[in-house]
Amino acid sequence: MWFRNLIPYRLRDQVAYDPETADQRLAALAFTPCGALEPSRSGFVPPLGPGAPLVHAAAGSLLFCLQEETKLLPAAVIREAMDERIGAVEAAEHRKVRKRERDRIRDEVVTDLMPRAFSRHKRTWGYLDTEAGYLVVDAGSEKQAEHFVEQLREAWGDLTLSPPETEMGPGTIMTRWLAQQQLPGDLELGEEAVLEDPNAEGCEVRVKRQDLTSEEMRAHIDAGKRVRRLAVTYSERLSAVIDTDLSLRRLKFHDVIREQAGDRDPESQAEQLDADFSLMTLELRTLIPRLMEWFGGEKAPS
């Protein structure tokens, strides 16, 4: 239960640490499987597994898990069935099937195949830190995170969230870190970065497993490129790639943190998840405010 990506949202209103009420709210959007003709469906499932509440509470945070089911209908399968039906019509009626009729046949094919389609399931995890005032979503893309937020808002009813903003642009500050080779005292450079040319859309440089203090990197900065993503290590406790949108990618908690969960000697998978979640949220409760401080502090809501 260690998040691998981190997209934070600022809570604009106080949320009470009330697991029972939160569970009741999410019950309205509890996951149920797709119907025979439904292409997709999403809803919340118990983080600790079947039979457990829809909300797991620990250390002032409320953990949620959104499950999505998507029916898989390969385009090649649809095309093959369409061609067969269109061919039968054209052979029987000695005429060409036009676009409108082709579209209708396609819809019929999808309807017929849908009940037999395989399903793919995906889970997205997130938690509300009621003490620090953040929603944290483990998502590899903004689209995935926004879907989680939309579902949580629908279930919650009165949840006001927005992406945090800092006083200074993260891209400007991270570019300065590379240019001056000076970082905050609790940060060390990693070996990965993405630089982009602000005057040429799509022009970017990606480096991995390279010395970011090298002359090559300095030449890119001198040529006017700006940092969009930068790999760092924080206080020798975790490492991540910071994005200019304040998300963290490839988040990795180091052994100094993970070993604390092992020291608790959990007896079940649920106890292990609870231990991991408690440690992770306490660590991120320190990291996220510090992330904002690196870029001049978080802006007050307008």
UniProtKB/Swiss-Prot annotation:
<dbReference type="Pfam" id="PF04381">
    <property type="entry name" value="RdgC"/>
</dbReference>
<keyword id="KW-0963">Cytoplasm</keyword>
<keyword id="KW-0233">DNA recombination</keyword>
<dbReference type="GO" id="GO:0003690">
    <property type="term" value="F:double-stranded DNA binding"/>
</dbReference>
<comment type="function">
    <text>May be involved in recombination.</text>
</comment>
<dbReference type="GO" id="GO:0005737">
    <property type="term" value="C:cytoplasm"/>
</dbReference>
<dbReference type="GO" id="GO:0006310">
    <property type="term" value="P:DNA recombination"/>
</dbReference>
<dbReference type="GO" id="GO:0043590">
    <property type="term" value="C:bacterial nucleoid"/>
</dbReference>
<protein>
    <recommendedName>
        <fullName>Recombination-associated protein RdgC</fullName>
    </recommendedName>
</protein>
<dbReference type="GO" id="GO:0000018">
    <property type="term" value="P:regulation of DNA recombination"/>
</dbReference>
<dbReference type="InterPro" id="IPR007476">
    <property type="entry name" value="RdgC"/>
</dbReference>
<comment type="similarity">
    <text>Belongs to the RdgC family.</text>
</comment>
